[in-house]
């Protein structure tokens, strides 16, 4: 009986990276429930057996994928704020965050049946890791921008959270206007009032 080829650490790393890319694409286009291990493996050009040498479950891949997306998003937002260090720069970072939310609804809309189907299969400790600490994220973004608030931190956070939640009204808004333009106007106006 011929032996199966052994994957090197580099091969494993490359396959994991490719699987996470495919997982993100499929999560955006068809959701968690409709994404199967078999279809991911076919697209990645690997066997299902190879998948299981890298991940114990489908949920492990999805968890690793959402962690990667969150980390990438944080890095992008913090980089904009570190590079610009102005109110305009902070507003630009919020616009980028809004665009990410628009392209990846599972980042903000965690109450959908599809996301709930994913999250309920995770161990409690993993669920805690998935939950994005948005207040801490806000605090770090403000710190990266070196901006000073005109108001209490929790109020500023609440205002920006409410602003970002307008993504939930995008279908209603898109009937009469470009919801990105509306968001951009609001963020530019509010950032001027929130920061010194």
Q: What label would you give each PLM region?
A:
Residues 120-161:
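Amphipathic alpha-helical packing segments from all-alpha helical-bundle domains
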Residues 145-189:
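Hydrophobic/aromatic-rich alpha-helical bundle segments in the mid-to-C-terminal region
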Residues 1-30, 38-39, 43:
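Basic, helix-initiating cap at the start of DNA-binding domains
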Residues 12-23, 40, 65-77, 138:
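Generic hydrophobic, amphipathic alpha-helix propensity
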């Amino acid at each position: 009986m011929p032996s199966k080829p052994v994957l090197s650490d580099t091969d494993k790393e490359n396959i994991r990276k490719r699987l996470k890319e495919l997982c993100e694409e499929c999560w955006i286009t068809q959701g968690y429930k409709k994404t199967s291990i078999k279809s991911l493996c076919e697209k990645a050009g690997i066997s299902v057996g190879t998948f299981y040498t890298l991940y114990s479950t489908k949920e492990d891949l999805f968890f690793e994928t959402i962690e990667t997306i969150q980390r990438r998003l944080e890095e992008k937002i913090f980089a904009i704020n570190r590079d610009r260090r102005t109110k305009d720069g902070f507003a630009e970072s919020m616009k980028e965050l809004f665009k990410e939310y628009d392209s990846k609804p599972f980042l903000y809309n965690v109450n959908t049946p599809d996301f709930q189907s994913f999250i309920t299969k995770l161990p409690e400790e993993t669920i805690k890791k998935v939950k994005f600490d948005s207040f801490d994220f806000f605090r770090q973004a403000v710190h990266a921008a070196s901006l000073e608030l005109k108001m209490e931190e929790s109020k500023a956070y609440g205002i920006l959270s409410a602003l970002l939640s307008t993504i939930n009204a995008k279908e209603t808004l898109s009937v009469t206007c470009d919801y990105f333009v509306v968001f951009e106007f609001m963020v530019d106006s509010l950032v001027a009032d929130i920061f010194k």
